[in-house]
Amino acid sequence: MERPIDLDSYERNTLGMITSPSGNQAKYRTTDRFLRELTSLKIGNEMSRSLLHCYYNTFYGNTEMPVYIDGHFKAIWTLKRVPKGKHGMMDRIMPGHEQVFLNGQDGHPLLHRTCPGDRHLTKELLPIVEDFENAIGGEVVNMVIVDAECCSLDQFKEFDKINKDRKMNIYLLTMMDSNQYHYDDLKIRNDNGLRPIKDSDFIPYKYDKKSRIRSWVTLVEFDYLSNANRKRKNKTTYMVRCSVVKKKNNKLSVIATNQPYDEVASGKELADQYYNRWPCQEAKFKEMKKYCNLNVNHGFKKKEVFNRMADKRLKRAEKSLAYDKRRLENLMGKYTHVKRQMEKRKARFKKDLEKLENQIERINERLEYHKGDENKQRKLWEKKVRNTGQLEGLYQEKIRVLKEKERILSKRKKQILKSIERNKTEVARWKKELENTPFYEIDTEMDHIMANFKILLENSLLYTKNTFFEGKVGMSTLIKQFINHYGDLHIPVGGKIFRFQLNKFDGKGLTKKMRYACKIFNEMKIRTADGVLLEMAVKR
């Protein structure tokens, strides 16, 4: 996982005596050949299952437990076309691997999957749980805790579906985005059913150093389909239980689960279980990146595959093009309707105007030949003239409205035509890319094997910290002051004991802690695969 420069020019026998039965020196060539041999054997998955048994029996052994699942993206620097994830670096979307980790409730990474960079976490959520339980040999997972990336109705229904075939129910616990709920839709359950949430329903949740309340929490029920039902005639419901955490600035965090209401202890415990993601998983990623080189890639062997990314872009462009064509067709229908309305208005105006002019002409004739009551005829003439002016004004107003609609539709037509041309260009581009550009996937076997070693190192560090130091030292202190500490290897005659004698420490506190750790280590009587007893001591 690291290549210290000391190993490149290492000429002594100590490292060889520990790592190889022959006692020969171990350099880069030895370690590289070993890794290549492991890769050629295709033992990554079998290795993961075997190590999982060890971790589970050592750290857990529970009949049931919650697990934390999240993805970690590792960027790959290559000129080849390989799958890309939703991760940017140096002003571009990076290709890489998506590694999905399953961690236990105490933070130990137990199992992982190495996938192409375009793999979404939702596609690996249930498969990695299934692999975990198959390796353990029984149903042990009762809760899967993930971030908001996996919060969807489809995921909740997937968990409901698999519970039909399980003896132990398994539930999903995740965070909801702010656009997935309305505050008014959060309901409190009482004896009479459901009622709106009130400020008095919240109880104190977190306190600051001065014992002042930082946040409040309450348990509510929420219809996940409430947003969709606003636009539907036939309404359906899907109820989830939510822990609502409110901060001082009234910002809400809504944590949702499909666990039945009767099985949820309280909103506080539900929130605690979700927020435990940070120490159990997010902090472990940070730790492993620093001490286990989690971000380092291993193995760049590629194989050519179907260009699914170009195919995805092509289908998206074709869908957009078809949508624009439908929009244009609908718009042209509206445009034709407006044109027809304008022609009808014009014809009707001419007809009405001609009718009024004929009436005025007849009135003028009657006035000229003094037929009928002259006052009535003049009043009627004035009325018809007034109607003619009103008719023209009304016509001009209606024509103005129709012309404004015509102008707006013409503007939209130009925009849609531009979009159609743009989508046609995109379709041609991605069709050419699909036909002519090779697409590769990186063989993940070597990286998968090395990730097993990285998980092994992380769990070994956690085991060392908790077993030999009772969890009283931080990981940084453990690495710098104890694991990387210098000393000598003393081998008595016969070679049946390896005694590691560590140099003195600077402070009495560190020396005392290390001597206590050496005492526990020696009492465990740890032996190598060859039967050699390992002992540790601090020089006086």
Locations of regions flagged by a protein language model:
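Domain-level cores of phosphate- or acyl-group-handling catalytic modules
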Residues: P116-D184
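An anionic, glycine-rich sequence signature occurring as long contiguous blocks
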Residues: K164-C280, K405, L502, Y516, ...
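Active-site-proximal, Lys/Arg-enriched surface segment
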Residues: E11-L102
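Short, conserved catalytic/metal-binding motifs centered on acidic residues
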Residues: M1, L7-Y10, T14-L15, K27, ...
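A short, flexible helix-boundary coil/loop motif
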Residues: K198-Y205, K209-I213, K315-R540
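Short amphipathic alpha-helical "interface-anchor" segments enriched in bulky aromatics
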Residues: G267-G299
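Electropositive, glycine- and tryptophan-enriched low-complexity nucleic-acid-binding patches
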Residues: M89-G137, N249-A256
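Extended, highly charged clamp/arch subdomains and adjacent linkers
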Residues: M1-R33, T63, F73, E361, ...
